From Swiss-Prot:
A biological process term (GO) from this entry: mRNA processing
Matching InterPro entries: Domain_X (IPR024937), Maturase_MatK (IPR002866), Maturase_MatK_N (IPR024942)
Family from the record: Belongs to the intron maturase 2 family. MatK subfamily.
Any one Pfam family match given in the protein's UniProt record, by short name: Intron_maturas2
Keywords from the named record: Chloroplast, mRNA processing, Plastid, RNA-binding, tRNA processing
Source species, domain of life: Eukaryota
Its job: Usually encoded in the trnK tRNA gene intron. Probably assists in splicing its own and other chloroplast group II introns.
Glycoprotein among keywords: no
Protein known as: Maturase K
Any GO molecular function: RNA binding
Amino acid sequence: MEKFEGYSEKHKSRQQYFVYPLLFQEYIYAFAHDYGLNGSEPVEIVSCNNKKFSSLLVKRLIIRMYQQNFLDNSVNHPNQDRLLDYKNYFYSEFYSQILSEGFAIVVEIPFSLRELSCPKEKEIPKFQNLRSIHSIFPFLEDKFLHLDYLSHIEIPYPIHLEILVQLLQYRIQDVPSLHLLRFFLNYYSNWNSFITSMKSIFFFQKENKRLFKFLYNSYVSEYEFFLLFLRKQSSCLPLASSGTFLERIHFSRKMEHFGIMYPGFSRKTLWFFMDPLMHYVRYQGKAILASKGSFFLKKKWKCYLINFWQYYFFFWTQPRRIHINQLANSCFDFMGYLSSVPKSPLLVRNQMLENSFLIDTRMKKFDTIVPATLLIGYLSKAQFCTGSGHPISKPIWTDLSDWDILDRFGRICRNLFHYHSGSSKKRTLYRLKYILRLSCARTLARKHKSTVRTFMQRLGSAFLEEFFTEEEQVFSLMFTKTTLFSFSGSHTERIWYLDIIRINDLVNPLN
């Protein structure tokens, strides 16, 4: 009880974060401009008569949004462009985008202060070096060998815009900021409908990248909070493995917050989800929920998730978005790999005194295969080959210099090898390498108006071979396992490169 009371006092102190006045500070929009130019992902900022950022113009835009005629227009003409006023340049799309970036920076401040004020004794230093994408593959290789069923979840979105604002009310106790967020979101969608149009989501994400990520992470954080809370409360075993991959979610404090908000939550219903061994991994709008329980238990979790999204987030999700498969008999698409846990036969000769006999055993092995058909399809879409994998020239690159052509082909080839370096079978990679090599040769031959044979005889194939096998200096981790018995062909070396987050679009089919 004292623990909950202490947390309640901390929760009340969060109400002192009043971030609305920061929207009228010049340096906030300077940060937004610098983020757009120097961010990890380039943000396209629309120019507007070469006008500079100004908090005064943003203030005029906010006042315009709160005027009564603006409200009347938004109700009577929901599809009208309500922020654009071509007679006044400060109502253009440029300043609405700047307001979006500035608002995203401002609302992130309470979360940053909360993270900095976290007590040192509650930190878990051993998890700091695991918050990277390359740690997921060794995790799957070590844990999934002991599991039976896997649920492949497509995290649903669309979600009502009002729900997004209500989710932030638990974290941001600033009414003017929340009202401003409502007005701004009303620009993209009518309040009486869902964001069901993929076109609306695409434009909102493109024009307001930082705000979109903030809202999406808040929604996913809320969903994972309830999911993992029920999972942890339903088992006596610690759930350290799942917490490894949930960055900046503050799991322990959320559990306390849940106890205060919902004190009457009955533990009697938790037996329904009892599962002593379960692992959860989320990536790019999808999630994997693996378990050692029965198929009936997985169906219970599926029903729970569907009802949870329906009654808590107030929207219906299709049951087909959650696929339940048995690991031993199926494969799943994960981060550009086709992963599976097949049972490999192993023949062991055992000799006891004068008698010798053979023991036929089956061992599980986490297998990662390069999706050849999918990657060839993307190469075909990028006009490197035909749909059947036959290499063709790249006409759009013939205006470049020879070195630029070689550099582009070589970069794509190296990225493919770096990203799929942990594959258990490299034959598909060599096939892709052959397609890119011959496509490069055809492109150069087309530029110089000669045949591939004549071009290769003049330059020699050794130059292309040396270029494509050149390795960049990248940091990598090598995960090896020590076994008591070494069998021929039973040990394969896996290398997972650390630069696979920033990669060419071709090697990431999810983009």
